[in-house]
Regions:
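A conserved structural/catalytic subdomain of Rossmann-like adenosyl-cofactor enzymes
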Residues: 93-346
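Conserved S-adenosyl-L-methionine
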Residues: 1-101, 106-110, 115, 164-167, ...
Length: 346
């Protein structure tokens, strides 16, 4: 799924040069390096930030191994949400041409929640910050903050892809709903598409995930793909993982790029249709429900109805017989005053 995000973000027909690529929760850099490969290592500069020291060190090593040493100085260890590092000379946050992200979905960020509430970058968290729950602070949906940070950090003609728990694409209220509404109802509709993936597709989560694709230059019609039934289950480091076959990856890529409509797999609804469906980004909600009609003669219809009635009568009769049997059994049950006395006398 790492290369598939890159393939869907970068069209091979595009001549992409001198661009910036960013991952605000980069880990060891798998996603952003796959993106750099799709663009061409010498045609892009990579910028990352991650809270883990160890991951950031691995990220640097990955850049060296992938002939991208020119980006080493842009690998930053730090808290992206509280202290975003990459800025312009005037102190404003830097904007990027391409962004990819597979952020943590849930994390306790109660200790810097108030910092995000009073964020100095106006409008960065436009849809709000998840509340601190009284219990289970580890369940705080931090990915919603990363999603908003990603949108804020994207150039006006930039493209992005972010991994979200599949619940995000259908949530009927709250921050998730506000973000989806913004992608559809903003000055421009910027939702490029959504691919709902099979479960266990990413190593770090067993949650069902979807990938949301954004194109800030504006979109006429998005493509929604339900790829949740694809893939084969494999064992990796003792854990079950789903792996997409080569032909399945190609199927998703071709469908997405060409905006094809495939029965029970992909749809291209208008943004008005998406509004009518409560801003749902789930392909399944737009699939046609098919009813198969069979041509039969009147005699055949009557014969089937007679058989149906006969079967139903037999079942009714059997049901009555069982009712009578149960009532008879209940009549045989009488009160026994000795029950319980033996135990009480011990």
């Amino acid at each position: 799924s790492d290369p598939i995000m890159a393939q869907l973000l970068v069209d091979p027909s595009e001549d992409v040069r001198s661009v910036t690529c960013y991952d605000p929760s980069a880990g060891t850099g798998t996603l952003v390096i796959a993106l750099a490969h799709a663009i061409g290592e010498q045609n892009c500069t990579v910028y990352t930030q991650d809270i883990s020291d160890k991951s950031s060190t691995m990220m640097m090593l990955n850049l060296i191994l992938n002939s991208m040493s020119h980006s080493l100085t842009h690998v930053i260890q730090g808290n992206t949400l509280k202290h975003p590092f990459h800025k312009n000379e005037d102190g404003s946050l830097r904007k990027f041409d391409y962004i990819v992200s597979n952020p943590p979905f849930k994390l306790d960020f109660s200790d810097y929640h108030s910092d995000l509430k009073t964020d100095s970058y106006k409008g960065r968290f436009f849809a709000g910050i998840p509340n601190i729950p009284s219990k289970n602070k580890k369940g705080m949906e931090i990915y919603l903050c990363f999603f908003q940070h990603l949108l804020y950090s994207l150039k006006e003609d930039g493209k992005a892809a972010i991994v979200v728990p599949t619940g995000f694409i259908t949530a009927k209220s709250g921050i998730a709903f506000k973000i989806r509404k913004h992608l559809v109802d903003g000055e421009k509709s910027i939702l490029r598409g959504v691919v709902s993936m099979p479960s266990n597709i990413f190593a770090n989560t067993g949650t069902n995930v979807s990938v949301v694709f954004i194109d800030k230059s504006g979109v006429d019609k998005p493509v929604l793909i339900d790829a949740s039934k694809l893939g084969e289950t494999i064992k990796e480091n003792g854990n079950q993982k789903t792996k997409l076959r080569t032909e399945e990856i190609q199927q998703i890529v071709n469908t997405f790029r060409n905006k094809e409509v495939v029965e029970d797999f992909s749809v291209t609804p208008t943004f008005d249709e998406i509004k009518e469906k409560g801003y749902s980004f789930s392909a399944g909600q737009y699939f046609d429900i098919k009813i198969d009609y069979v041509d039969i003669t009147e005699d055949e219809f009557n014969r089937r109805m007679d058989n149906f009635k006969t079967t139903l009568r037999q079942q009714f009769n059997e049901s009555h017989r069982l009712e009578e049997e149960i009532l008879k059994q209940l009549d045989c049950i009488g009160f026994n005053e000795n029950v319980g006395k033996e135990n009480s006398n011990e």
